[in-house]
């Protein structure tokens, strides 16, 4: 029997949510799971990933790669997500790539198309912001990521998405890029 590694795993823990996704390369099958991260979320991450894989009958040796959110976002959240992805990648001998959390937020919020701003609180009246347009399964970055005063966004066109979880499918789809996971703390 020949083992086919056809699944890509996406992980994001940079925001108040823990987002997981599985994407099948050939069949375009997608599964998502998002839950509040909360206290102790980092300790639950690896068991959550194992349960997520099991719930969808995907064995670890069927993973072809892992994509992980690199922020901007929570320092502890970023560290736990990236460390878990790197540990799993090393154990399974699969590539691990990083992609932006703001991009993953825009990808999910703009699922039906259109354009808008993904925002994360940068504190002190500032926001991490990215303006994007969704075209099919692609995301076209119009501006950003930038960190700006919130007041600067008041005159910008487009809907703002701030309290939405990142769509980890974005990270899964980018799992086979050659971008190493370098955190963007903000």
Predicted features, each with a name:
Residues 34-37, 49, 72:
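Short, well-ordered turn and helix-capping elements at secondary-structure junctions
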Residues 49-65:
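Phosphate/pyrophosphate-binding loops at sites that engage ATP/ADP/AMP, CoA/4′-phosphopantetheine
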Residues 65-98:
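DPxDG-like acidic metal-binding loop motif
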Residues 50, 71, 93, 110-111:
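Generic short alpha-helical segment signal, independent of protein family or function
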Residues 1-30, 36-44, 58, 97-186:
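Oxyanion-binding and handling regions
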Residues 44-47, 83, 87, 104:
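Short amphipathic alpha-helical face segments that pack within enzyme cores
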